[in-house]
């Protein structure tokens, strides 16, 4: 699986076991990602932070 790093078009190949790409952003600024990368389990959203997870190449 290939996931974008914080600044596309840069990306990396995920290590074994991390089969999701994710994008983390603040609820107040959804168009400005705070973090991007590979993850094993999609974290739960909170009141301030949301996560978008997906499992196809460079979908984050």
UniProtKB/Swiss-Prot annotation:
Which PROSITE patterns would you find in this protein's record? SNAKE_TOXIN
Where's it found, cell-wise? Secreted; Target cell membrane
Q: In which tissues is it expressed?
A: Expressed by the venom gland.
The principal localisation class reads secreted
Q: Cite the effect that the entry attributes to residue 52 to V.
A: In minor component
Matching entries from Gene3D superfamilies are given as: CD59
Question: What role does this protein play?
Answer: Shows cytolytic activity on many different cells by forming pore in lipid membranes. In vivo, increases heart rate or kills the animal by cardiac arrest. In addition, it binds to heparin with high affinity, interacts with Kv channel-interacting protein 1 (KCNIP1) in a calcium-independent manner, and binds to integrin alpha-V/beta-3 (ITGAV/ITGB3) with moderate affinity.
Q: How does the record describe its quaternary structure?
A: Monomer in solution; Homodimer and oligomer in the presence of negatively charged lipids forming a pore with a size ranging between 20 and 30 Angstroms.
Name the protein family: Belongs to the three-finger toxin family. Short-chain subfamily. Type IA cytotoxin sub-subfamily.
User: What is the protein name given in its UniProt record?
Assistant: Cytotoxin 6
Q: Which organism is it from?
A: Naja annulifera (Banded Egyptian cobra)
């Amino acid at each position: 699986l290939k996931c974008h790093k914080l600044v596309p078009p840069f990306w990396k190949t995920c290590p074994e076991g991390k089969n999701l790409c994710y994008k983390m952003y603040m609820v107040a600024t959804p168009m400005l990602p705070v973090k991007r990368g590979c993850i094993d389990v999609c974290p739960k959203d909170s009141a301030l932070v949301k996560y978008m997870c997906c499992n196809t190449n460079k979908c984050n």
